[in-house]
Amino acid sequence: AMGKATKALVLSADKNSAYYNETDPKAGHLWGDAAAAFFISKERVSEKDSEIVDVYTQGLGYLGKAPDAVHLRPRDGGIMMPEGRDVFIQACTYMPKNVLYLLEKNGYTLDNLTYFIGHQANMRIMSNIAKQLNLPEEKFLHNIEELGNTGSVSSALVYAQNDHSFKNGDLVAITVFGGGYSTGACLIKC
């Protein structure tokens, strides 16, 4: 971001099993552990390098019911979402909004988008976004049905799992929304 580094290794990991409570009938089974790593370089290192077109981040901790939305207590209750409905509403609002912002800023439209990868909180959010954007389900990549919500790793992991199938020229949007109401998006040109 400051122009000093030419190479970086970006890591993300979440050990959600430290938080979840299997006896919780509403959420105990929804979480998964995962990690992902990406090597980013200013110079090309292979013929199949993808380009990060743009990145956008935003903190929305002041919005809605953010301060009370999610509680992480490893040894005392696990992950609790007393304001889960508000998290759902804000995620369904800001994930597509962030992608549309980046597309427009960089001279693209939804028609240019090859794949959409959203934070893997639940499939209801992805279905809601697909309807809002009028995008076919085939453009949405996901792994939540096999891994659960892997937290901050979820979108990066979906990208990594599908990297082999991206073709030269594909435009991939990745967008996230966390329980702390941190949100963002990234456009990648393959």
Describe the function of each predicted region.
Residues 3-34:
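Flexible, glycine-rich active-site loops centered on histidine and acidic residues
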